[in-house]
């Protein structure tokens, strides 16, 4: 599997061979949301880090997906709006949300690696 990085908002990012980053939510996030019933994907084009780019609705709550880094969204997962249950079934695979070209290729290194993300999850469990 390709190398993954994570955000404190429980999004995962995969660096693909073409230099693009693919984004989805972690198993922890989908578990916290419960059964996902609606997905609204981002518009193609430039988005600033931290901006709301997608929306998930579940039986428990609605949640915004934030743009993890400055960049240009170049592809969306057209399957998700018609099959939102994929988010629960395969959050780290088929349920990716979008692919984007980061404005700063070096920003990847500032994201959480697996060990740092695991520490975040453990801290949340202890809180």
Swiss-Prot record:
Which PROSITE patterns does its entry note?
BIOTINYL_LIPOYL (PS50968)
Any one GO CC term of the record: glycine cleavage complex
One GO term (biological process):
glycine decarboxylation via glycine cleavage system
Check the record and name the NCBIfam families matching this protein: gcvH, PRK01202.1
- Family, as annotated: Belongs to the GcvH family.
Signal sequence annotation? none
Name of the protein in its database record: Glycine cleavage system H protein 1
Residue list for modification N6-lipoyllysine:
60
Family annotation (Pfam families): GCV_H
| Subunit-level organization | The glycine cleavage system is composed of four proteins: P, T, L and H.
Output the HAMAP family linked to this UniProt entry: GcvH (MF_00272)
């Amino acid at each position: 599997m390709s190398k993954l990085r994570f955000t404190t908002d429980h999004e995962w990012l995969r660096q693909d061979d073409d230099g693009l980053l693919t984004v989805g939510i972690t198993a922890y996030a989908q578990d916290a949301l419960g059964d996902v019933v609606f997905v609204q994907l981002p518009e193609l084009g430039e988005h600033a880090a931290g901006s709301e780019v997608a929306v998930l609705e579940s039986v428990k709550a609605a949640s915004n997906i934030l743009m993890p880094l400055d960049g240009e969204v170049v592809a969306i997962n057209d399957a998700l709006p018609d099959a939102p249950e994929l988010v629960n079934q395969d959050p780290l695979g088929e349920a990716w949300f979008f692919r984007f070209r980061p404005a700063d290729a070096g920003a990847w290194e500032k994201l959480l690696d697996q060990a740092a993300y695991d520490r975040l999850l453990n801290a949340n469990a202890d809180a």
